[in-house]
Amino acid sequence: MAMQMQLEANADTSVEEESFGPQPVSRLEQCGINANDVKKLEEAGFHTEEAVAYAPKKELINIKGISEAKADKILTEAAKLVPMGFTTATEFHQRRSEIIQITTGSKELDKLLQGGIETGSITEMFGEFRTGKTQICHTLAVTCQLPIDRGGGEGKAMYIDTEGTFRPERLLAVAERYGLSGSDVLDNVAYARGFNTDHQTQLLYQASAMMVESRYALLIVDSATALYRTDYSGRGELSARQMHLARFLRMLLRLADEFGVTVVITNQVVAQVDGAAMFAADPKKPIGGNIIAHASTTRLYLRKGRGETRICKIYDSPCLPEAEAMFAINADGVGDAKD
């Protein structure tokens, strides 16, 4: 009898776990959607019912074998499973209070960000070379694996590297600092090298499939814009570049919404060479224009300080005040600057 009660309790727990978080698109079969149509959705990159519910109708119609009538039925059933209506600000405030923040490794930087890098949104870091963008990414790839009470996200990290600057040795140094097993830390980081803008976008489809299978806390794209500077050149291709970049950023935002992962992207800067630059205190601005500015939830501007110290400024945020903090790049990752 006791054994039976234990089994029932375990079954209840597994049901609870299943109903929490993003649900696989295969659940649509229970709502009367044909298994072949579900397979077509998966092949097109829709791996969760949330991905289907958030998609515009024309995106589903573009899938080979999905007619307008089928698209309507799929969207209707997905909308029943995913809550997408109005909610009170009280309920939303409650959900916001449960958001996990991942430590950057520096207490001063965490204080500036009111806890750390926020999950479920896009954080953009931009600055010149040697300002610490990649070093923060490497540190976050380890700290996201820490328990929540130690400032982590209790999940794996995904790292898309477009500049060839990923170094596993740095992860091992940070892991040692936090007392984590080096081999476990490396096993929990999924790494991919992006070779062009189309490949970079294709990797996000793979990322979506992997996130359904396993718990990921962080997705890093370092750098999100480097390949756009080389694949598209001149003003003639500016419109095409911005449209492609907008689609890429929209996919990132969708992954943040669907899976609640922290998305961290790095961006490069460009020197302003027009007449106004003469009067600007700092004649450098992030590339990508308004497209990337609107897609990022929080924008951090990094610049060099003295020696190994770096300065981080809140450039844009919906809730953080404009302020600065100093941090240092140490042998064991990002830390506090020594006075």
Curated annotation (Swiss-Prot):
The gene is RAD51. ATP binds at residues 127-134. Its main location: nucleus. Forms linear homooligomers, giving rise to a RAD51 nucleoprotein filament, which is essential for strand-pairing reactions during DNA recombination. Interacts with BRCA1 and either directly or indirectly with p53. Interacts with XRCC3, RAD54L and RAD54B. Interacts with the BCDX2 subcomplex RAD51C:RAD51B. Component of the homologous recombination repair (HR) complex composed of ERCC5/XPG, BRCA2, PALB2, DSS1 and RAD51. Interacts directly with PALB2 which may serve as a scaffold for a HR complex containing PALB2, BRCA2, RAD51C, RAD51 and XRCC3. Interacts with RAD51AP1 and RAD51AP2. One of its GO terms (biological process) is mitotic recombination-dependent replication fork processing. Residues 1-24 are annotated as: Disordered. InterPro entries: AAA+_ATPase (IPR003593), DNA_recomb/repair_Rad51 (IPR011941), DNA_recomb/repair_Rad51_C (IPR013632), DNA_recomb/repair_RecA-like (IPR016467), DNA_repair_Rad51/TF_NusA_a-hlx (IPR010995), P-loop_NTPase (IPR027417), RecA_ATP-bd (IPR020588), RecA_monomer-monomer_interface (IPR020587). The modification Phosphotyrosine is found at residue 54. Belongs to the RecA family. RAD51 subfamily. Residues 48-77 form the HhH domain. The modification N-acetylalanine is found at residue 2. Residues 184-257 are annotated as: Interaction with PALB2. This is DNA repair protein RAD51 homolog 1. A motif (Nuclear export signal) lies at residues 245-260. SMART domains: AAA. The modification Phosphothreonine is found at residues 13, 309. There is a cross-link at residues 58, 64 (Glycyl lysine isopeptide (Lys-Gly) (interchain with G-Cter in ubiquitin)). One of its GO terms (molecular function) is double-stranded DNA binding.
